Amino acid sequence: MQGDPMPDQILQFTHPPVPRQPPVKPSSPLTWPDDALNRPFLKERLDEFQRWLADAFDAGETAEILVDARTLYIDQLLRQLWHYHGLAHAPHTALVAVGGYGRGELHPLSDIDVLVLSQAPLTPPQQQHISELLTLLWDLKLEVGHSVRSIAECLEEGRADLTVATNLIESRLICGDLALFLTLQKQVFSDDFWPSRAFFPAKLAEQQERHSRYHGTSYNLEPDIKSSPGGLRDIHTLLWVAHRHFGATSMDEMVGFGFITRAERDELNECQSFLWRTRFALHLVLNRYDNRLLFDRQQNVAQLLRYQGEGNLPVERMMKDFFRVTRRVSELNQMLLQLFDEAILALAPDEKPQPLDDEFQLRGNLIDLRDETLFSRQPEAILLLFWQMVRNRHIEGIYSATLRQLRYARRHLKAPLCTSPEARTLFMRILHQPGAVKHALLPMHRHSVLWAYMPQWSNIVGQMQFDLFHAYTVDEHTIRVLLKLESFADESQRPYHPLCVELFPRLSQRHLLLVAALFHDIAKGRGGDHSQLGARDVLEFAALHDLPAEDAQLVAWLVESHLVMSVTAQRRDIQEPDVLVQFAGEMQSESRLHYLLCLTVADICATNETLWNSWKQSLLRELFFATEKQLRRGIHVSPDVRERVRHNRRQSLVLLRMEGIDEQRLQEIWSRCRADYFLRHTPNQLAWHARHMVLHDHDEPLVLISPQATRGGTEIFIHNQDRPYLFAAVTGELDRRNLSVHDAQIFTNRDGMAMDTFVVLEPDGSPLSPDRHPVIRQALLQILLPGDYRHPRVRRPSSKLRHFNVDTSVVFLPSPTERRSYLELTALDQPGLLARVSEVFVDLGISLHGARISTIGERVEDLFILADGDRRALSRAMQAEVRRRLTEALNPNDKV
């Protein structure tokens, strides 16, 4: 059971800078003569100072020192310019720093927010001087925000706007009338201007609203250093509330008031220092103010922060540290705001704690220790806390004093909690309870108890993957998988996941599915096959927790096979009998199939919110029901393909006879179709095609677009004289229209007519918008007109794709038939890819019979069904040539 035994270690991978001689600091603005204060001189001095900030940071200076230096530099610049523009002697006027500038937090690109405070309305000359000053600052490319107000106006605006009130609370005098500024301060901190009982709940609501914009987690892989949960704003919120209630202006003063311990202060300081350093580095690589760690910035920031490793490892290590820091800030923020709540909005005296048992009591809806030494004396009692939470659903959280004791006990653990037999018993009892994830595992994760319980968990805490596919860190993704599984017990989810809601309550060992979910990605980031490594880990867990051998085999199989169903449904040809037989053989039983379907759906939904759509749902349903039939028929009994062809024709004919179809004309058309056409379409699809082909001029191109969603997407059917590059032309046009092709069935009749079917989706994964049908149909008819093939115009690639590299891989899968070859292509997603691939096939005389298209973030993983000119599988020599040509076409820098 390998892992980091220190759940309270924050930073793991940071490397100290190589010490070197710091650069010489530029001169103070206060030393500049008045006759030099022109725009070119000032621009040169500011550029010089920005270069010094970057050089000093590179030399190892701390962000704290440099942020203070920029704040002081801007203070001195504004004082000098205030004097230069004749404002120093303006009566009863002051220049005040507000917002982040008021706090003294000026990073390289931070806004400079100032208040011009005046007792009386400004005179026209004063207005002119201030306008000239601001214009100069803007010309110098400084991001200056300003307001001009009297004390009365400040108070009026502040009472109406919480943000203005907060800015006033942390205001700081730069220059001007001190007495006027102190009068403002006295008013701002009076009891009738945002008293603590109003200010605290307002700031709490503001934080909750901000968190909701980030889906309540800091684990989005492109986080905002300032505003994401656990970011700098959460630290600011603590400081604002402490400042307003206690007058504390620093963490040291908060210790003095007894509201945080020295250890908590040190932890907050360490977290803030890391966030400041990361934000400082981000500002150095940008030209415009922004606090988002977007993918295209992460590599440069990691390099500035001196993270080491090959490939994407520096980014992954930096982000792992980042997510561990934000996790710690979130926990401290929750605990300390609750302490403020108790101090500011104290419980009424008659609201006494209500005993739960000998160890715990309720304070309102929060669980609290009756003996604060319990966790230190008996660490396994930490699990007892979460056992109570899952049994008493009305408990909404942990009381601050108990959370403080939990943090202390967690920090002083001598061994993982799972080494305690009592803790193991409690953990398994928790997993058996309804609501175990929401009421126990989720808070256990939030408070690092999962880490303290099972060492393997530490490896994935904050573990990201540098791609566009995974939206969350591995630990956050795993928790979301668990939550999604638990949601399948909720009848309200039936419209979204009807099959899973039907199956999940019938699973006899639902707790084993939770164990499998906990371990399905536990080995990510270790190297090697994470499914196999995770299966070994879960077997160790099963042995330690005395699971029966049959249960251990099930969870190990689920972990090792957790990707099999998704891959088979999306990237294999399940119409081929051998593919279905092989998949059914891997399932072995309907019970295992049911478990795996629930895990697969939860895994897809929890990977990326945009990933699950009706198309994927239809693929999994199709595979699920086909496999159920196969298991009932006998694992190794191949489906009767000829009977399926006859069945589809018969059922389609029944539908068409009800409409009075011209059967003679229909049989003429069907007689030219090959068996595969009837095998790979449903009776409804066959009838839809036929009713239009019977009435259509055989020599004219036919384009049909399904009015309703088909298999979760929009089906486009094309009947036209076959010709080279037809597939390339169609897919190129669809791509240019920003439609994604997810499936293609390509047939050429005995008379040389193409009958091609495409399933397409809009960029958001929805079926084609009905108002686009006429435009798309007309565009396709246009490209079907006779004429030479022209390379389709392609869309501009996404800017995000420029920052990713995917090695082109061409693999020929084992073929169940001598008539087809199955090519699996992995490459960087790019506009016009399908057209480019198709052109290679045409140039080599290869016919394309089908395609299954899967886009996973920045990479495509596509399956192509091919045959040579003699309608047979490709020779080894031809496979090698295809591999070479595709690699050249998709990535000229790759070598075979």
Swiss-Prot record:
UniProt xrefs under CDD domains = ACT_ACR-UUR-like_2, ACT_UUR-like_1, HDc, NT_GlnE_GlnD_like
Q: What is its EC number?
A: 2.7.7.59, 3.1.4.-
Q: How is it regulated at the activity level?
A: Uridylyltransferase (UTase) activity is inhibited by glutamine, while glutamine activates uridylyl-removing (UR) activity.
Question: Which GO annotations describe the biological process of this protein?
Answer: regulation of nitrogen utilization
- Region (Uridylyltransferase) residue ranges read 1-355
UniProt keyword terms in alphabetical order: Hydrolase, Magnesium, Multifunctional enzyme, Nucleotidyltransferase, Repeat, Transferase
Per UniProt, the ranges with Pro residues bias are 16-26
| Domain ACT intervals | 715-796, 822-896
Q: Does the keyword Kinase apply?
A: no
Region feature Uridylyl-removing, mapped onto this chain: 356-714
One of this protein's Pfam families, by short name?
A: HD
Task: Output the Gene Ontology terms for molecular function.
Answer: [protein-PII] uridylyltransferase activity; phosphoric diester hydrolase activity
Where do the HD domain residues begin and end? 474-596
| Needed cofactors | Mg(2+)
Q: Which reaction does it catalyse?
A: [protein-PII]-L-tyrosine + UTP = [protein-PII]-uridylyl-L-tyrosine + diphosphate; [protein-PII]-uridylyl-L-tyrosine + H2O = [protein-PII]-L-tyrosine + UMP + H(+)
The segments labelled Disordered in the record are 1-31
Q: Its family?
A: Belongs to the GlnD family.
Written domain comment of the UniProt record:
Has four distinct domains: an N-terminal nucleotidyltransferase (NT) domain responsible for UTase activity, a central HD domain that encodes UR activity, and two C-terminal ACT domains that seem to have a role in glutamine sensing.
Protein purpose: Modifies, by uridylylation and deuridylylation, the PII regulatory proteins (GlnB and homologs), in response to the nitrogen status of the cell that GlnD senses through the glutamine level. Under low glutamine levels, catalyzes the conversion of the PII proteins and UTP to PII-UMP and PPi, while under higher glutamine levels, GlnD hydrolyzes PII-UMP to PII and UMP (deuridylylation). Thus, controls uridylylation state and activity of the PII proteins, and plays an important role in the regulation of nitrogen assimilation and metabolism.
Protein name, per record: Bifunctional uridylyltransferase/uridylyl-removing enzyme
UniProt organism field: Sodalis glossinidius (strain morsitans)
